[in-house]
Design a protein with these regions (language model features):
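Gly/Pro-biased beta-strand-loop elements
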Residues: 2, 6-98
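Exported/periplasmic cell-wall-interacting domains
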Residues: 71-139
Length: 139
């Protein structure tokens, strides 16, 4: 009597890495779980949350793509507590722009603190600091 053998399950593709998500057009920030956390902004003036101006230095929002989230630190120079650098992944087109960060708003809270950085509320920055997920997708 022949014994039936079960076929091994087909290999599955690895899941996409978990990431934080920032949507410049709306300012929406989502946690790696997909949960909406709140809104931030990027860029200023005509470039405020305007992805069509992502190539404009010091005005447009952070360019779409993937970024590594650096270690968080407190910046006494004006960016506030719980600040991090964003390092673009190799496939991200930055249009020659650099120095992107996630930081807090200015004291006026009038959406003028960004020259391309992501400005996010403190509770979101605190959540990012505590998270093991260190990838941000700007969509």
């Amino acid at each position: 009597m022949a014994t039936a053998t079960l076929a091994a399950p087909a290999p599955t593709l690895p899941a996409a890495p978990l990431s934080w998500k920032f949507y410049p057009l709306s300012g929406m920030i989502k946690a790696p779980s997909g949960a909406f956390l709140g809104n931030g902004y990027s860029g200023n003036g005509q470039g405020l949350n305007n992805p069509a101006m992502e190539n404009v230095h010091n005005i447009g929002p952070i360019p779409r793509g993937a970024y590594y989230i650096g270690d968080f630190f407190d910046d006494d120079g004006g960016k506030g507590p719980t600040v991090c650098d964003l390092v673009p992944c190799s496939e991200t087109e930055t249009f020659g722009r650099c120095g992107f960060m996630i930081h807090g708003d200015n004291k006026k809270a009038n959406h003028t603190a960004s020259e391309g950085c992501i400005v996010a509320p403190r509770f979101i920055r605190d959540a990012m600091k505590l998270s093991p997920v260190k990838l941000l997708q700007v969509l």
